[in-house]
Amino acid sequence: MTSSSSNRQFLHRTANTFLTYPQCPEHPEIISQRIWDLVGRWNPLYIICAQEAHEDGNMHLHALIQTDKQVRTTDSRFFDIDGFHPNIQSAMSPNKVRDYILKEPLALFERGTFVPRKKTFLGNSSKGNSEKKPSKDEIMQDIISHATSKPEYLSMVRKSFPYDWATKLQYFEYSANKLFPDIQEEFINPHPTSEPDLLCNESIKDWLQPNIYQVSPQAYMLLQPNCYTVDDAISDLQWLDDLTSKQIMDQESRASTSSVQQGQENLLGPEA
């Protein structure tokens, strides 16, 4: 089973999906059409959906959907229909799943052509030598085609190639990570917006002005040992503020005059 209780850990990757909708009274044809549309991008080939009754009389649905390309989703709610959430599984044996769905349906709907699972090369070593032995490439291709999760992929490799597993495990782990990449967890800000908003630019400016850009009399007295009282410190700071303001105004005035003179010089043409 590839479903999970958490969207962050969920990964469904298969061409044969087995769905069970518990407590779902909808008709199989309606559900089948909705599922067919959901997997449209992966080219659906076949779907079968059957309605069965619980012992308490409530209805539930079983469905098998086959696609040309592997359905791949990290959303555990991808197959939800009108609030009905299914159990999602990879159908390792479509033949057995289809037989299970057909066991005692109250209503049934099919669309497309059923695709039996291709014959696997795994586990055929006990057969006689009259049959051609599959190559490593064929076995590996079979594993890649049928594995539905990283643990299952590595387990199949270990069973088929025990020596290679022991000597080249890092390569198989690398390919497993590429075939079944980990789902990135969604970032959650550990410092959500508060009241008042600490990211408010105006609030930051109001704090910077008195705490960073201004020198308090007490801090000035620490830097000037000859200043003994708060009043003297305030007087000195006021004088420094006036002096600084005057110097800034003088610099701006000189810069403005220089700019005007430069502009006048540019207007004069060469002497005749």
Swiss-Prot record:
Residues binding a divalent metal cation, per UniProt: E52, H60, H62, E104
Region annotation (Binding to RBR1) ranges: 198-202
Biased composition (Polar residues): 250-265
Ranges where the CRESS-DNA virus Rep endonuclease domain occurs: 11-114
Keyword Hydrolase in annotation: yes
GO cellular component, one term: host cell nucleus
Main location: host cell
Function in brief: Implicated in enhancement of V-sense gene expression. Acts a an inhibitor of C-sense gene transcription.
Protein family membership: Belongs to the geminiviridae Rep protein family.
Name the record gives this protein: Replication-associated protein A
Organism: Maize streak virus genotype D (isolate Raw) (MSV)
